[in-house]
Amino acid sequence: MKIGFDHEKYLEEQSKYILERVDSYDKLYLEFGGKLFNDRHAMRVLPGFDENAKIKLLHKLKEKVEVVICVYAGDIERNKIRGDFGITYDMDVLRLIDDLRTYELEVNSVVITRYNGQPATTVFINKLERRGIKVYKHKSTKGYPTDVDTIVSEEGYGQNPYIETTKPIVVVTAPGPGSGKLATCLSQLYHESKRGNAAGYSKFETFPVWNVPLKHPLNIAYEAATVDLKDVNMLDSFHMDAYNKVTVNYNRDIESFPVLKRIIEKITCKESIYKSPTDMGVNRVGFGIVDDDAVKEASKQEIIRRYFKTGCDYKKGYADKETFDRSKLIMEEVDLKETDRKVVLPAREKSAKLKMATDENEICPVVALELSDGKILTGKSSDLMDGAAAVIINAIKYLANISDDIYLISPVILEPIMNLKSKTFNEKNISLNCEEVLTALSISAATNPTAQVAMEKLPLLRGCQAHATTILSRADDTTLGKLGIDVTCDPNYPSESLYYNN
């Protein structure tokens, strides 16, 4: 992989800039957009970016930082899932707290936004409080977003309890978008102002990158990633008017800026120092780019990856036709084809050959995997194991220079697992998935040195690219993610079964 981003330079520049911003206030409320941990989108489009860069940045500032986590009551009530981890938002709050503590960061509290006594949310509040975590309940803000006089009054932000904080930087984060981070920050500004404290607000949003051209693939990749939110990158007209400089922001921030500026001015009783939405941001990621061509190519690959993901989401019913059509338009805008992703054609060609040989109507499930040396291997589904498991076994054999003829896993281990699935669990599909095969491999490695050598090659798969001709099961998708493999799928189910495809 060609490196296009200097992680150390970015960390230095970013931490310095945040500290400069906080110098103007007694306290800075810093709204953190995107992912604090495991930001694989940023890692993919900025080769060299550390997926945990943001949390390492906060760790560097830990003496000055405390964290408030927001979650929208409605998201808890309807069990909203965080797609990259496959866990509900309430569980992700617990995960966030544990992970933040690992980095020695103080978690001040959890804020339940737009709370109206929802039963499942009340249970979650009880769970947190009984584990010693402070919880604040915020209602919907009366008058929001247009009636500024009501918003900035005792009927608006004044209805919310004040969150007691002690450190100069308060990071406000959440499991996902629409969790009420901005409202929480502004509510705190209102209460701080009432107490005579000089508090400020800033936003840390990695994408779009404000000092990279509007139609740069890096910024278009952000549109592809947020196609379901209908985010559109735009030139910041407010910044142009104020400074005669071209910067990029996204539609929601630009559209909400006039109201946001008025709210801040009403709270502070003075003119805002911010002349544009770009001014509000503290993002310095653009200054870490050291090879623009590498970033462009990586971003184009991410656009294709997002196109496939949206296609599968549409097939599953998670995305509407408009969203899928928009992802197609983004592909066309950058003049990209599905087959510009190297692993797509080998997977489809292998699948077509198998279909001709078996004379079946259904698409043959095949997974193609590109290794770091450019070698592309394939794996097909069989009665023994599925395509994802097969390609992983083929890959570690190749990396360990083990002949195809040699079995890594003894039938003595495989047969009892298959019997357990068929006879005890009464499962219809008894072929082993990726996790089951790797578990069997780890057992074999205890007595088989060849299996042990192959096992040791698994870390080399991190960062590899894969493509499947059919939608992978949730189990395989999760396992490949844990291995650090970026996988895409054609939007086809492996069979006509409705329930047994999951």
From Swiss-Prot:
Gene3D superfamilies: dip2346 domain like, Domain of unknown function (DUF1846), C-terminal subdomain
Signal peptide as annotated in the record: none
Domain of life: Bacteria
Pfam families: DUF1846, DUF1846_C
Disulfide bonds listed in the record: none
Similarity-based family: Belongs to the UPF0371 family.
Record-linked HAMAP family: UPF0371 (MF_01567)
Protein name in the entry: UPF0371 protein CLL_A2797
Organism: Clostridium botulinum (strain Eklund 17B / Type B)
Lineage per the UniProt record: Bacteria, Bacillati, Bacillota, Clostridia, Eubacteriales
